[in-house]
Amino acid sequence: MINSLSIIKRITYLLFVLIFVCVIFLVNHIFNHANLPINEILIKGQYQHIDREQINLITEEYVQGNFFNLNLYEARSAFKQLPWVRDVDLRRKWPDQLVITIEEHKPIARWEGIGLVNDKGEIFIASTEENLPIFVGPENFVKEMTIKFREINKILAKELIHISIIKLSERLSWEIKTNNFIRVVLGKKNVSSRVKSFIKNYQFVLAELKSEIDYVDMRYRDGFSVRKTKKKNKDKTLNSTI
């Protein structure tokens, strides 16, 4: 019994010494590397609009200090100021690397001519010459507009049509203009079913009139109305085949 206790004490003592040595070694290692510089910077992410030269300038200015005292917050804030940067992640990688992962805004539309809308339904300010559809509506409904834009475009694609302008009024009434210059009034309710009705009637009725159409009003329960571009023609109401 005494021998067993003696053995346990010895093992405990040895473990204590081992832990103590490891701690001393670790502290010494950190102390000796207190001035460890960042020797390699890895840039990750796919981007088309972000200027690589701007990334390099920010890296040179803000990636200062060693592995331990590098101010990642300031560097991240600087990257976030670039027009096309949606998000950025900076991460230290032992022993001397900094990994920068950049997420670029992916534009899907213009916002009333003063900004752009990304695929997450967020408005951002940047410039591009891309031919993009236009969103017009209350700014706090941009996410809803993004969802509705995709939903309607998916239905229109059956006839190789897509949205050039989508509008949401202050009273939350929807309206679109297609790439073949047809304005479609959809109203507040049953928007998807009204778009489907528009496509169904487009195939059999509206396609032949498209060059003459000013707008199509789909807010009728069992039909729709068409206003022709020529002023001498009065509004014409057609029964849909729903």
Regions found by a protein language model. Name each.
Residues 32-128:
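Terminal hydrophobic membrane-targeting helix
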Residues 80-86, 154-162, 206-210:
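Short secondary-structure junctions
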Residues 52, 56, 72, 76, ...:
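Extracytoplasmic/secreted envelope proteins and their assembly/folding machinery
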